Amino acid sequence: MNKVESALSRTTDTKALVIGTETLPQVADMFRKLFPDKRALVVADANTWRVAGDDVHKILAGAGVAQDEPYVFTDPKLYAEWAYVGELDTVLSETDAVPVAVGSGVINDLTKLCSSHNGRRYMVVGTAASMDGYTAYGASITKDGNKQTFDCPAPLGMVLDPNIAAAAPAKLSASGYADLIAKIPAGADWMLADAVGSELMDDFAFSVVQDGLKEALCDPAGVHAGNVAKVEQLAEGLLLSGFAMQATQSSRPASGAEHQFSHLWDMEHLKYNGASVSHGFKVGIGTLASTAFLEMLLETPVEELDVEKCVAAWKSWEETEADIRRIFDNDPEFVARGLVETLSLI
C-alpha cells in the first residue's frame, strides 16, 4: 500500500484520488463512479477555465455525462469571500447538478462550502500545487472581515495533473512549497502540545504528513522551474496533509504557530503592492518566526527556571485585558477575538 492509499484508508470524505501526468481524461470515469446518473456542473474562474475547465467540460460531454452550463466567475479579483459564497449558492440552489470545481484554493473552498450548503458532495480538478486545502475538511472564507474556517466535507474525489500544476505561475508553486515546509515546525508544535497533554498525538496522521516531507521539499529550485516530477512530489505532500486533517477532523496535523501569524494578517487584510498576499506566503513568513522561537526555546536552560517566581510574575487578568486593548488599538473586531482566545488559555 503506497502513501496515498494508506492515507485514503483513514479519510472520512475523500474516496478517490488520481494524481499523475495526462490524467485529465480520467475525470469522466471518476465522476460516473462517484456520482452515477448525476448531472455535472463545472465551476471555474476565467483563468482556470482556460487552462483546464474547458477541457474538463468537453471530456465530460464526450463521455456522455449530462451537464448544466458551466459557471465561470469573471471577477479578476476573485477571493474566498462571503459575497462569492452567496453568488455560487444561488447557482447551486437552482439545480441538483454535482459541482466539479476546476481551480485551486479559492475555487475549491467556494465550491466546497456551497456544495455543503446545498446538501451535496462535489469533486475537484486541481490546477496548481499552491496549498494543502484541496483535501482538507473545512473551507477558509472571509466573512465580516474575518478569515474563518467553516465546517464542510472535503471533495469526494480529486484529479490533479502535474503537467497543468507545473505550468501554473511560479508564485503558486512557491506558495504551496511554503505551506508544506510549514509542516516541519507545525509537527514540532504538536509534539510539544502532546508532551504537556494539551493536544494528544495521532501517530497515523503525524506520519502521513511528516514521512514524505524530505522527498517533497528536496528540490525547491526544481519546483520553481516548473519541473513536473518535483511539482508532483510537492502536490502529493500537500494532498497528504489534507488527508491527515480529514482523518482527525482538525487542522492540528498540518498547522501550528506559523499559521497563527497568517490568521492575524488575514484579519489585518494584509496587502503587498495593493494585492492580497497568498496563504502560503503568509505562512512562510510565519514559519521563519516560529522556527526562530523554537531555536530560542532549545537554547534556553528551562531546567534552571524558577517556576514559582515565573508564576508570581504572571500578569493579572485585568492587566492582560488592558494589554490586549492596547496592542489591538481598541479595534473592536480584534479585541473581541483576542479576549476570547486568551481566556480560553487560562
Question: Which ranges hold each PLM region?
Answer:
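Active-site histidine-anchored catalytic micro-motif
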Residues: 102, 131-135, 277
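Solvent-exposed alpha-helices and their adjacent loops that cap or buttress functional pockets
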Residues: 9-11, 34-35, 91-94, 115, ...
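Active-site segments that bind and position negatively charged phosphate/pyrophosphate groups
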Residues: 208-346
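A glycine/threonine-rich phosphate-anchoring loop and its flanking beta-alpha core
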Residues: 116-215
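Residues that form or flank phosphate/diphosphate-binding pockets in enzymes
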Residues: 51, 109, 168
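A short, small-residue-rich loop immediately preceding and capping a beta-strand
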Residues: 92-114, 118-128
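ATP/NTP phosphate-donor binding region
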Residues: 1-98
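Short beta-strand/turn micro-motifs composed of small residues
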Residues: 43-44, 103, 160
